Amino acid sequence: MSTSFASPAVAAPPRPAVGATRRTRVLIGTDTYPPDVNGAAYFTARLARGLAARGARVHVVCPSPEGAPYTAERGGVVEHRLRSVSSLVHDSVRLAVPLGVRGHLDRLLDRVRPDAVHIQNHFLVGRMLAAAAHARGVPVVATNHFMPENLFDYVHVPAPLRPHAARLAWWDLGAVLSRAEHVTTPTPAAARLLVDQGFTRPVEPVSCGIDLDRFSPLDGGAATRRRLRARLGVPDHRTVLFVGRLDEEKRVDELVRAVALTDGVQLVLAGHGAHRARLEELAAEVGAADRVVFLGFVPHADLPDVYRCADVWAIAGTAELQSIATLEAMASGLPVVAADAMALPHLVEEGGNGYLYPPGSPGALAARVESVVADEGRRLGMGARSRDMAELHRLEDSLERFERIYREASAGAGAGAGAGATRSGR
């Protein structure tokens, strides 16, 4: 284990033999990576491991979860962990210590010699890695997972200042992304959001993707579901499910209020977060304490069965740029009831695989959930349609597209360097 920024254990990649096909080399920079629990961290880990499984040489540079820097290989991915400190705004996120990071990134780029750098955030690691890559003529691909609204509750921005803070945050994001050779977001809605905020460069929607083998519908009937529920500690009742962080931005309180308005439907919440105690109090206040099940953190191996335990999926968030958890639910054959906000409508075919509801209306949410669970034929048909729609988001397709993006960016950078070309900004 390395204790310095230099990560001396990582040697420069060998040059391929004459006539051999060289493996793609990519250096992914991110300010959040497992064990962090959030969509960006989850996507980045799946991207890195998926690319490695397809034969790429993948390096990830990110903050250390322990504070001290180190280098390790996991799942075929070399992780370069930077010295970090607590973010103070959320107990699951640590920040890289700025001192010494640029020099470390310079040395890392010189050793790895990537075909492309792929940044997942515009914060410290992503920003500094992009600058270091540009200084060496290495092309930068950037994927945006950010909305200012997702940070406001953590950094406690007063409500009157939020519009001003949001404008500043969007400007700062655009300043970093504008220097990338290729910019992606998970959905067309997320791409339009960047354009609406004044970003003038092309933005390509590339789905986060879903592993359709890992997440699949229940293979068996009611008896199989009962056994799964018993194993996971879920009562055998009609179940609406949410998987994710129990934080304010996810608006889980809306789900609790909605289930209290239903006739005997239970809500299963899989995940942890700062608002769990508040949600437990709310469940008691609205008379649904016996119908809200808190599973807490669910081990990776058990997650597919958690989806198979449910009858319907519900999500109330209004700042989702895609929602990997909703894709997992769809791949698992669950109907979807989702807030009509941001990118969630892209995952709902009204009356086909589920329903949208007006955000902030627990009554409307409850009515749609009951409509699904009251008719088993409708529920099964909607679940089958969800699975069909999820197949449009195959993880392998997303990985293949990113591989092509890296090759295109690398070829373009080489041609530009040869012609002495310069890149324009925002």
Task: Name each model feature, range by range.
Residues 350-351, 355-362, 371-377:
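Conserved acidic donor-binding segment of nucleotide-sugar-dependent glycosyltransferases
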Residues 318:
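Aromatic "clamp/platform" in nucleotide-sugar-dependent glycosyltransferases that forms part
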Residues 62, 163-223, 234-235:
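Donor nucleotide-sugar binding/catalytic pocket of nucleotide-sugar-dependent glycosyltransferases
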Residues 371, 378-392:
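A short, well-ordered alpha-helix in the C-terminal region of glycosyltransferases
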Residues 1-83, 407, 423-426:
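N-terminal subdomain of nucleotide-sugar transferases
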Residues 109, 176-177, 297-298, 305-310:
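Short alpha-helical donor nucleotide-sugar binding micro-motif in glycosyltransferases
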Residues 42, 238-261, 274-280, 363:
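A conserved mid-protein helix/loop that constitutes part of the nucleotide-sugar donor-binding site
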Residues 335-339, 348:
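Short hydrophobic beta-strand element within catalytic cores of glycosyltransferases
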